[in-house]
Regions:
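Generic beta-sheet signal
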Residues: 2-7, 47, 101-109, 132
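Catalytic core of membrane glycerolipid acyltransferases/transacylases, capturing the structured
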Residues: 3-84
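Internal catalytic-core helix/loop-beta-alpha segment
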Residues: 71-115
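Short, well-structured alpha-helical segments that form the helix of a local strand-helix-strand
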Residues: 180-188
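Short catalytic/ligand-binding loop motif for oxyanion handling, primarily in non-cytosolic enzymes
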Residues: 12-16, 57-60, 115-117, 143-147, ...
Length: 215
């Protein structure tokens, strides 16, 4: 319990669904494979994810997904496509704390599926307050494979990757909110220094790898 997974974000639902599978596959002794999904009959149930309340109320599927461990929170900076400024709802923070006490929580600290957007300070405050083990995750390929919701396949044959890193070393008492935000930014590879032009040779190698991918 009290484990917080922090990740970059590429789709609304495919990212989280993949993490549920990977976590349960790993707990079942599998390495780099989610084949033979027998573990779904006895999954780890105390896995939660933080999601925007507005997103989880939009449509039937979103409402169904909300029952699969969503901790819904109100965005403080955006609502219905418009920029807003509002205070953090203390109940949202409390609900995340309750989820951490019960199990594992997944959060996307940028609060958006757009790449290289700023890390929201709310995640750093949660870390300072509840002192969880913080495990960074870096995902790739989901944005190219799926639509924004992560439901409809946009392009087949794209390799999706998920790198689960070592826990972050955090001094909960002495590190500032800004220090923690900076650590998160680098850990999930969303700092501006990670923006780079991929050489043509690398792109070709990735395409060849996708062709060899086993489903």
């Amino acid at each position: 319990t009290n484990v917080l997974f922090v990740s970059n974000h590429q789709t609304y639902f495919a990212d989280v669904t993949a993490m549920f599978h990977v976590f349960n596959a790993s707990l079942s002794g599998r390495v780099d494979s989610i084949k033979n999904v027998g573990y779904i009959w006895q999954p780890k149930l105390n896995i939660y994810y933080v999601a925007a309340k507005e997103t989880m109320n939009a449509g039937l599927l979103s409402r169904i997904m909300a029952y699969a461990g969503a901790v819904s929170v109100e965005r403080t900076w955006r609502a219905k496509g418009q920029e807003v400024e509002r205070k953090v709802n203390p109940n949202d923070t409390k609900n995340i704390g309750t989820a951490l006490k019960d199990g594992w929580v997944i959060t996307f600290p940028q609060g958006t599926t757009k790449p290289f957007k700023p890390i929201r300070k709310g995640t750093a405050h949660i870390i300072k307050q509840y002192k969880p083990v913080v495990i960074p995750i870096v995902i790739d390929g989901f944005r190219r494979s799926f639509d924004k919701k992560g439901i409809r396949i946009k392009k087949r044959g794209i390799l999706q990757t998920m790198q689960i890193k070592e826990p972050l070393q955090i001094d909960y008492e002495n590190e500032s909110i800004e220090d923690i935000v900076s650590k998160l930014e680098y850990a999930i590879e969303q700092h501006s220094s990670f923006q780079k032009v991929i050489p043509a040779e690398t792109v070709k190698e990735m395409e060849e790898l996708n062709k060899k991918r086993e489903y």
